[in-house]
Amino acid sequence: MNSMKTEENKSFSAMEDDQRTRPEVSKDTVMKQTHADTPVDHCLSGIRKCSSTFKLKSEVNKHETALEMQNPNLNNKECCFTFTLNGNSRKLDRSVFTAYGKPSESIYSALSANDYFSERIKNQFNKNIIVYEEKTIDGHINLGMPLKCLPSDSHFKITFGQRKSSKEDGHILRQCENPNMECILFHVVAIGRTRKKIVKINELHEKGSKLCIYALKGETIEGALCKDGRFRSDIGEFEWKLKEGHKKIYGKQSMVDEVSGKVLEMDISKKKALQQKDIHKKIKQNESATDEINHQSLIQSKKKVHKPKKDGETKDVEHSREQILPPQDLSHYIKDKTRQTIPRIRNYYFCSLPRKYRQINSQVRRRPHLGRRYAINLDVQKEAINLLKNYQTLNEAIMHQYPNFKEEAQWVRKYFREEQKRMNLSPAKQFNIYKKDFGKMTANSVSVATCEQLTYYSKSVGFMQWDNNGNTGNATCFVFNGGYIFTCRHVVHLMVGKNTHPSLWPDIISKCAKVTFTYTEFCPTPDNWFSIEPWLKVSNENLDYAILKLKENGNAFPPGLWRQISPQPSTGLIYLIGHPEGQIKKIDGCTVIPLNERLKKYPNDCQDGLVDLYDTTSNVYCMFTQRSFLSEVWNTHTLSYDTCFSDGSSGSPVFNASGKLVALHTFGLFYQRGFNVHALIEFGYSMDSILCDIKKTNESLYKSLNDEKLETYDEEKGKQESSLQDHQIEPMEC
């Protein structure tokens, strides 16, 4: 093993004490890239001389191949270039500095390793780095260019320009995805023919200015310009071509191999190439072009390897070169396609607006402050990325299944416009409302402890059913303590019927009504039903509550909820447990409507029904106006919420997020639109208000409801029943 020490600069000799070892000759010979018109006897340092054409060739002559096989670490040798740095245009700094780096490193990487440059760049925040090579290339350089592409004796003039916006990721550079691949250099004039502005940076938009573009062999011209980063972001939306003088014309899909070393001028069409009908077609073309680039470049590279040389090469060298060529990385193509698609989609929605709205929009949009523009650009970028994630093209098969898709889409747009006028909403605010309502913005997850607690309390919730001589119905109730159950006063009215004297109510209820607490999956057996005693001492029509008493049937009463009383919450989540529409026992989680928002809520619901009256079929409560429900809106004894519980849920207990009993569900009005039932208003009266009214009306009953002896008696009776059931189960004899 021989050792080799790089001696590019004497000042670096002390830093490079570690000698580099030369590995043995193997078949994995590194494929070397040389510039055009390079003499055979050139010293094989990391820096290559470049002719005026700046074309990079992949052919390697016999002498260079032999040297590579003897020294495979040749490409690891350091390259260098000089530069001057002018941070302030008023103060000219003529100091010359030298930067070093490996051939595979980028220009920016070599500059960052220089202490002077790294120190000066700290003070140039939010500025573009403009690099001009003034000796050999005579053009503005991309900072991502590998050092192997630079001719020897390259000298850079580096200046800083103020960036207008911060959406570009720092310094504009293109990362070299595959340093082992051959690079192509060509020039593009910074000012276009038809459209003059083709670059992002104003400092580059000067007469006579040229941009030096580097690209990987096998790429298209369009891909190289889009990935360069210095051209305008919507360059992919236009039809353009590159001209060499007045003779040769190159299109977007032309290969960069054809323009190597040439100076080209861009001619952009005045009309944008992508209209609404061409968006999907263009996206598909870009996807296929990406695959073709990758496939074609690999084929060309393999053909280049297998092509025999006139001077002759061994099969081992050809085989090793074929193995050393890795497949191209498609990440930059994906980024390129994403960057091109975002402005297309934005342009599509802008073009879909009527002309008068576009004029208004253009008048309103003024150039904001720099900090404001930075925030706007970030928001636009995030929205575009989210739009791309959810963007999907519907194929013809799906469209045939939905022939009315366009009509439905127009109907939705019309509805949104009417809602914006009616509610005085901006499109952004309207979108955020729908996003909150339907986009899972509000977390509705429930802890397991709360679920277990609610499941235990559901044992106290009963299904009440009655049949008063053909007058049938059902409702919900719950056990408060002992055999006392709470339900709604209007439920009692439904049981006994109209124009029935109150003195007859207890007997009628006792004969026609029954309660079960086990209707959770299947219809309960007769043993699981409780009758009701002819007892009705306390009820209140204003608070809509009534207290009934269960008749003993040998079974223990369910546990009561009298220990779980809590004040009603002003906001947050609540849970209702009941039997909506006479169905099995269910739990509904919903949100509380704060007192100050009730006045906005109910008139809006009424307006919704009136505005969409032409689209409804029946049962729209058109008699409600903005003055409706004013007593309930400002009533502090009520708790308002949005629930899906409808008929049959009156008398359901309402629990807060901690599982405490806060209200008795009493009032709910619904209307039918089409085949769907919508809630108009839902109320429950707080348990604190109900208990205070009971204490004023019948203090002895209030004490009985809070008597611990009733609960103790029920617990002992429940234990006796469970022990009797255990004794009844006898073991089988063998």
From Swiss-Prot:
Q: Which GO terms describe its cellular component?
A: chromatin; cytoplasm; nuclear lamina; nucleus
| Keyword annotations of the record | Acetylation, Disease variant, Hydrolase, Isopeptide bond, Protease, Ubl conjugation
**Protein's UniProt keywords contain Acetylation:** yes
Which residue stretches belong to region Disordered? 1-32, 285-321, 712-734
Source organism, top-level taxon: Eukaryota
Q: Does the keyword Hydrolase apply?
A: yes
**Record cross-link Glycyl lysine isopeptide (Lys-Gly) (interchain with G-Cter in SUMO2), residues:** K284
Q: For bias kind Basic and acidic residues, which ranges apply? A: 1-10, 17-32, 310-321
Q: Which residues carry this modification: N-acetylmethionine?
A: M1
Which GO biological process categories is it annotated with?
DNA replication; proteolysis
- The residues annotated as the active site are H490 (charge relay system), D544 (charge relay system), S650 (charge relay system)
Alphabetized Pfam families for the sequence: Trypsin_2
What is an example of a GO molecular function annotated in this UniProt entry?
Answer: serine-type peptidase activity
Q: What is its EC number?
A: 3.4.21.-
The family database entries (Gene3D superfamilies) matched by this protein are listed as:
Trypsin-like serine proteases
Which sequence ranges form a coiled-coil region, renumbered to this chain? Answer: none
Quote the tissue specificity entry.
Answer: Widely expressed.
Involvement in disease: Poikiloderma, hereditary fibrosing, with tendon contractures, myopathy, and pulmonary fibrosis: An autosomal dominant form of hereditary poikiloderma, a genodermatosis characterized by mottled pigmentation, telangiectasia, and epidermal atrophy. POIKTMP features include tendon contracture, myopathy, and progressive pulmonary fibrosis.
Family, per the entry?
A: Belongs to the FAM111 family.
Q: What does this protein do?
A: Serine protease.
User: Protein name, please?
Assistant: Serine protease FAM111B
Instruction: Please report the organism this UniProt entry assigns to the protein.
Output: Homo sapiens
Name of the gene encoding the protein in the UniProt record:
FAM111B
